[in-house]
Each structure stands twice: as C-alpha cells, then as structure tokens.
C-alpha cells in the first residue's frame, strides 16, 4: 500500500489505470448509526460532470449526482458496520471492515482500490491511500457522495422514528442539540455505546 499526500496529476494518471475502484466512508464521528462506506468503479466512456468531495456539495447536488452515479457507473457497492460492531472492535477497525465489505460487493473485481485518507484495509489486491482523495479523484468523489446520501437517508429514517432527537438536522453528530436530546430522552439502541458522550448518558 502506498500513501499519497499532495499527489500530482502525473501520479494520479499513473495509479488510475484499468477498472479501479474509489472508496470512501461517511459517519465515523456521529454518536449513532452505522458507519457507511461505498466503492465505485466509474465508466471512463460515460463521464459524470460535477463530482467533488461530498462535503463541498449541496444536498440537492448530492442527490442529483447520486442518481447519475447509479445510472452511469460500471459498479457501485455500499458497505456498513453497525453500532454493535463499532462498539466491539472500535470505529477505526469497523470503518476498515465496512470498506472491505463495499469492495467485496462490487459486481466487477477492480484492478486496484483507491481509498480516501491515510490508510487502507487489506483488500487482497493493490491499493493506495490518497489524502484528500475525495477532492482529487472522481471515483473517490463518487464513493463519498454515495456513502453520504445513503447515511443521510438512514438518519432521516431514524428521525421519522424518533422525531424528538432531531437526527434530520445533525445527522447524529455530537452537536449541542444532540447532547440535549440525550440528556432529556436517554440513549437509543442505535447509539454507539463505546463513544464517551453516549456512555455518560447511560
């Protein structure tokens, strides 16, 4: 595994060969719900305009691109690790496991895997970690968008079930509103009990 920081266009060209998969995660920081990952193999002959780091896109733009990715990509797969798994093996290991699940779920076996960040799990094939890759490589950008939309939808479903917690607004992140809801209503089965603010509310 190679880790790239400040990657050059030439380095990108050198590693972006064949049917490579981009991988990213969403949801390491929240106090509740799954950590969600996605793996995407784009079609170089059917490009998608406007891909970028999901955090830099509006919700409307993410939804639009999400639909285009589903239509145009060669393969898209979503992985996740549950709160119970996060509590058992910790958030870092759970994230790596969810990434492995996303790649394993692809309908096409990729030639290599490019992961946003500074580390990769063992995919059983060539892989590269690319710092800030979600803003540099379209396949990683696409994965970040898919993971973000999927996790946000999970939080909206949870918000419909437990409206008093405001999950549709803070998406489970440790905000003042979330802390206040924990203090007032207590924890839910979906909360990550290994995270300190949740433990303290138990």
Swiss-Prot record:
Q: Where in the cell is it found?
A: Cytoplasm
One GO term under biological process is: mismatch repair
Entry keyword Transferase: no
Transmembrane helix in keyword set: no
Cofactor detail note? Manganese or magnesium. Binds 1 divalent metal ion per monomer in the absence of substrate. May bind a second metal ion after substrate binding.
Query: InterPro entries per the record?
Result: RNase_HII (IPR022898), RNase_HII/HIII (IPR001352), RNase_HII/HIII_dom (IPR024567), RNaseH-like_sf (IPR012337), RNaseH_sf (IPR036397)
Pinpoint the RNase H type-2 domain residues. Answer: 18-202
Top-rank taxon of the source lineage equals Bacteria
One annotated Gene Ontology cellular component of this protein: ribonuclease H2 complex
Q: Which cofactor(s) are needed, names only?
A: Mn(2+); Mg(2+)
Record GO terms (molecular function): manganese ion binding; RNA binding; RNA-DNA hybrid ribonuclease activity
Q: Which UniProt keywords apply?
A: Cytoplasm, Endonuclease, Hydrolase, Manganese, Metal-binding, Nuclease
Residues bound to a divalent metal cation? 24-25, 116
One Pfam family named in its UniProt record: RNase_HII
Catalysed reactions, semicolon-separated: Endonucleolytic cleavage to 5'-phosphomonoester
Write the Enzyme Commission number(s) for this entry: 3.1.26.4
**Homology family:** Belongs to the RNase HII family.
User: What is the annotated role of this protein in its UniProt record?
Assistant: Endonuclease that specifically degrades the RNA of RNA-DNA hybrids.
**PANTHER family according to UniProt:** RIBONUCLEASE H2 SUBUNIT A, RIBONUCLEASE HII
Q: What is this protein called?
A: Ribonuclease HII
Protein species of origin: Shewanella piezotolerans (strain WP3 / JCM 13877)
């Amino acid at each position: 595994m190679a880790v790239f920081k400040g990657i050059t266009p030439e380095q990108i060209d050198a590693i972006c060969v064949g049917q490579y998969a981009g991988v990213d995660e969403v949801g390491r920081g929240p106090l509740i719900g799954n950590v969600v990952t996605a793996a995407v193999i784009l079609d170089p002959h059917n490009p998608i305009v406007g891909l970028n780091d999901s955090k830099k896109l509006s919700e409307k733009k993410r939804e639009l691109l999400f639909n285009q990715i589903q239509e145009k990509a060669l393969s898209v797969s979503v992985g996740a690790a549950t709160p119970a798994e996060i509590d058992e093996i910790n958030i870092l290991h759970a994230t790596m496991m969810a990434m492995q699940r996303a790649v394993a779920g692809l309908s096409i076996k990729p030639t290599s895997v490019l992961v946003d960040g500074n580390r990769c799990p063992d995919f059983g094939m060539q892989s590269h970690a690319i710092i800030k890759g979600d803003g540099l490589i379209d396949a990683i950008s696409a994965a970040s968008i898919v993971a973000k939309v999927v996790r946000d939808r999970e939080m909206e479903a949870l918000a419909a079930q437990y409206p008093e917690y405001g999950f549709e607004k803070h998406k489970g992140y440790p905000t003042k509103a979330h802390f206040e809801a924990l203090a007032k209503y207590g924890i839910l089965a979906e909360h990550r009990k290994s995270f300190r603010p949740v433990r303290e509310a138990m």
